[in-house]
């Protein structure tokens, strides 16, 4: 699957509802998750209800990024689908690619990824917070 979003992708067949989560998407942003499946399977929607995914490419709109991440986790664990992508869609129709940002999931090691907040010692070498309190030193 490519990084750009194809809005003509088929959506899963719903056997429930989204709980009214997408009503505000006309004035606010919404999120889309896309994935490819080898066969049709029934899955649980994070907003409640179930849907039947199509064989091939699928596109599902959700109101929150967390809902897309929850569905992605379900696709990864239950159906062994690793090629899902998450996009933010603005009211003007512009789509922004969100996840996985550099092509590798955050829990995997990527040689090009720079660590954030990495400290080059183990936890036993940390300073005692009581000794540096009110000294304007940082303990991390």
Curated annotation (Swiss-Prot):
Localization of this protein: Plastid, Chloroplast thylakoid membrane
InterPro entries attached to this UniProt entry: PsaD, PsaD_sf
Predominant location: plastid
GO biological process: photosynthesis
Membrane-topology annotation of the record: Peripheral membrane protein
Cellular compartments per GO CC: chloroplast thylakoid membrane; photosystem I reaction center
TM spans (from-to): none
The keyword Plastid appears for this protein: yes
Pfam families: PsaD
Keyword annotations of the record: Chloroplast, Membrane, Photosynthesis, Photosystem I, Plastid, Thylakoid
Function recorded in the entry: PsaD can form complexes with ferredoxin and ferredoxin-oxidoreductase in photosystem I (PS I) reaction center.
Family assignment from sequence similarity: Belongs to the PsaD family.
Name of the molecule in the record: Photosystem I reaction center subunit II
């Amino acid at each position: 699957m490519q990084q750009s979003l194809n809005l003509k992708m088929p959506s899963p067949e719903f056997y429930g509802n989204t709980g009214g989560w997408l009503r505000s998407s006309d004035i606010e942003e919404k999120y889309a998750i896309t994935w490819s499946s080898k066969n049709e399977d029934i899955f649980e929607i994070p907003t409640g209800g179930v849907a039947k995914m199509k064989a091939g490419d699928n596109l599902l709109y959700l109101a929150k990024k967390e809902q897309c991440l929850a569905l992605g986790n379900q696709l990864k664990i239950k159906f062994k689908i690793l090629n899902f992508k998450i996009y933010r869609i603005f009211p003007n129709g512009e789509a922004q690619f969100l996840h996985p940002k550099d092509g590798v999931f955050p829990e995997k090691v990527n040689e090009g990824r720079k660590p954030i907040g990495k400290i080059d010692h183990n936890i036993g070498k940390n300073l005692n917070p009581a000794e540096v309190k009110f000294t304007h030193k940082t303990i991390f």
